Amino acid sequence: MTPIQKTATVGGKDILLETGKVAKQAHGSVWVRLGDSIVLVTAVSAAEKKEGIDFFPLTVDYQEKLFAAGRVPGSFFRREGRPTEKETLTSRLVDRSCRPLFAEGYSNETQVIATVISFDQENDTDVLALTGASAALHISDIPFGGPIAGVRVARVGGQLVANPTLAQRAEADLDVVMAASRDAIVMVEGGAQEVSEAVMIEALLFGQAAVQPLLDAQDALRAATGNKARRSFDPPKNDVELRAKVKALTWEKVKEAYGRNEKHDRYGRLSEIKKELLQALKDEAAGDAAKLATIALREKEIKGYYEDVKYDYMRKMITDERRRIGGRGMADIRKITCEVGLLPRVHGSSLFTRGETQALVATTLGTAEDEQRVEMLTGMVFKKFMLHYNFPPFSVGEVKFLRSPGRREIGHGALAERALRAVMPPEDQFPYTVRVVSDIMESNGSSSMASVCGGCLSLMDAGVPIKAPVAGIAMGLIKEGEKIAILSDILGDEDHLGDMDFKVCGTAAGITSIQMDIKIGGVTRDILEQALAQAAEGRKHILGEMAKALSAPRGSISAYAPRITTIKIRPERIKDIIGPGGKTIKDITARTGTSINIEDDGSVSIASPNQDKVEEAIKMIRGLTQEAEVGRIYLGTVRKIAEFGAFVEIFPGTDGLIHISELSDKRVKSVSDVLSEGEEVMVKVISVDRSGKIRLSRKEALADSAKKSEGTEPPKGEPAK
């Protein structure tokens, strides 16, 4: 096959889509290039459907090869290891964008693999993977309803930029990744520095317009590859008569169940209705072995019709009756309770409860040694702020094995972390490494938003001087024709059965994090404006409830948290603190029980829960790094006697020479006539040359002391007063 290339211009830069050159045995493969960043994306789908499942078995893997940036992995085996957080999050971005576009009922195992094979240190590769996934699926025979395309939108200096460079992103106050089709925004994920709702909407619409050339390029690529026919598959059965019977037997019962407030009560009743449905159909077929056998064979189909009844009733209840599960109104938020400081030995803690969703959140303050070190294409990255989200099975009343965090947990944690990172203090004001852990105690929707709220309270309880409190709210959308309902603080059912999951986090001043997944087309600007305005009102209500527990950061950190003090020394004196083989710094940390971190610029951070120990370590460091001042008088110790003079230690590690002529104003035959080793002597610094050699004078020190009527002897190693 001759390689085929198509180019699209986005944000003033060309993006190349190429197929037919590599990975030709994949059902679809596309090479995507922006600058010198290249991502290879492949799509393969099994020939036969996977039996016995009620979901679409799609797997998306995004992987970054370190050779792409000219780096050798730092692991023992020098191979890439488990996926990094960025790889996991990018895999989720692609999955969330593409999954809703596959044909309903298609259940063949499908895998999309995006591999970064070149990285130019300027153009990020996540949006290339997103566009490449759509292109690979679009040119294949897999029943995919694309194309879509990905773009990153940033606001730099007040101007919106499509696919900004890494340098531009560092200066941006808004940074979102989004996927869009010709007429709809499909997915949004990003953060901001307290921007307004109007700015966010402009960014989303700007991004949707920016991807249109990429959609044209994908259509052109598909046409050039022969417009492969989509493979056929068995669509879901639709027995109109059986569907109507299921509805007749369950509609009123479902109506009653959705009026129950308590989650497990409601779920229990809905499960009972399903059993009653199957039993009613079996009773109707009693005595007819063939009908009974048919019901047994079609049980999965019957359950599917029952799920459709639940779906239809809940949406009708919301759009027609303007009533939600449990009787709430469209903008109503569940009851909120907050508690802080409930874990006595933890640096900061909170318990945030909203309805039947509850998060127990703890904050730990650490030192620079606790930073997370991550090897990435851009080099070694150090994270000083982390938020980890855990979703144990007991939170939803289930029994499961406890495993390491999955993609969902990593994604929820990243969303909450991004929301709070925007208000974290700069390192020079608060030099701590901060770890926030959110454990979900119970869940019925919006647990990631509970983590944001609980995380904010926990940070304030720990005394972290955040810029402003942050809250999060999950919004939903039900759209039936012209009937539209926008829901605040959605439940799990409303998320599952709705058309949009829209999470918005921020302060009273603006948005700090956003995540949106839209399952339908045609979400207009008016709908986005209404949803964001309603989210802002809900966010402010939640902030008010949080303020009842704690309205601002505590004035001091926990008694059990390390106290960090930072001092500055001359960079060339760093070696004096470290000592040969680290001997000196190890001795200081062992004697004081402190943790010491030294930066190349001479910043020295000393940490310990005991402030007295910090001061002790500072005194030792000051002693090692003091600079001799010309004209100052010091009390020193004679370390060595020579024919021409004496070497005197004026403070630890720093010696100077008293020439024999500077011992006294009288002639001295031998140095040993005046001084002996180990003797303390008052000396004055008379010069320090370029190489750092110090000349001392005893006679000038004595003369100066005689002139002072009330002079006092200085402490050893310190200047005389």
Swiss-Prot record:
It is found in: Cytoplasm. Its cofactor is Mg(2+). Residues 562-621 form the KH domain. It is an enzyme of class 2 (transferase). Mg(2+) binds at D495, D501. Belongs to the polyribonucleotide nucleotidyltransferase family. This is Polyribonucleotide nucleotidyltransferase. The gene is pnp.
